[in-house]
Amino acid sequence: MKKKQQSSAKFAVILTIVVVVLLAAIVIINNKTEQGNEAVSGQPSIKGQPVLGKDDAPVTVVEFGDYKCPSCKVFNSDIFPKIQKDFIDKGDVKFSFVNVMFHGTGSRLAALASEEVWKEDPDSFWAFHEKLFEKQPDTEQEWVTPAVLGDLAKSTTKVKPETLKDNLDKETFASQVEKDSDLNQKMNVNATPTIYVNDKVIKNFADYNEIKKTIEKELKGK
């Protein structure tokens, strides 16, 4: 009887230890998952990326965005013009856009087209960029096609529609898009738009006051 009690006690102790270890493991995994869902701090490299503003501007704002992302459309229509007026046009900020492709084939096509425009007609890139967001419909549908991208290129750039379509078929600028994907992974970008002000991640992309205060703080620190 005594041996049975001792065995039961040992089993209870072992079971308790196992449960504690499992609970600790779950907590650690959850913490890692929560941390993994946040973009990491640190200034993203904009080498080879589209840039608007003076090269020597003291503050860099980077948008990780997707041309099929509705929230990115809101940022570019409502928030970006304020950044441009208050800081870019005054030489205080340079702005860069990095492609993120969360919405399938259409996202990739748009990214490939934007890379071609940037490489072949950089002066027209931002006009193409703006029109591409404006073209995004209010309802979820597959609207990004080679024909649509060709028409936009024709109306905003010097890139020939037939050349763009041919390069889309061949994925000529795939290496540039893959560089964007590598940067997304490095910065742990899991949501669009993700906005950086130098090495600071903006918590709410739609809060212009947060963006403005962060830029002003960075300017004072320069």
What is each stretch, according to the model?
Residues 20-26, 36-44, 121-133:
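Short N-terminal signal/transit or membrane-insertion segments
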Residues 1-30, 64-66, 80, 151-222:
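C-terminal cap of thioredoxin/glutaredoxin-like
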Residues 65-68, 73-154, 187-190:
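Structural alpha/beta surface segment adjacent to cysteine/selenocysteine redox centers
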Residues 49, 99-101, 181, 199:
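Short, well-ordered turn and helix-capping elements at secondary-structure junctions
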Residues 53-54, 102, 135, 204:
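Generic structural "secondary-structure junction" signal
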Residues 32-63, 85:
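N-terminal, intrinsically disordered, polar/charged segments of Gram-positive cell-envelope systems
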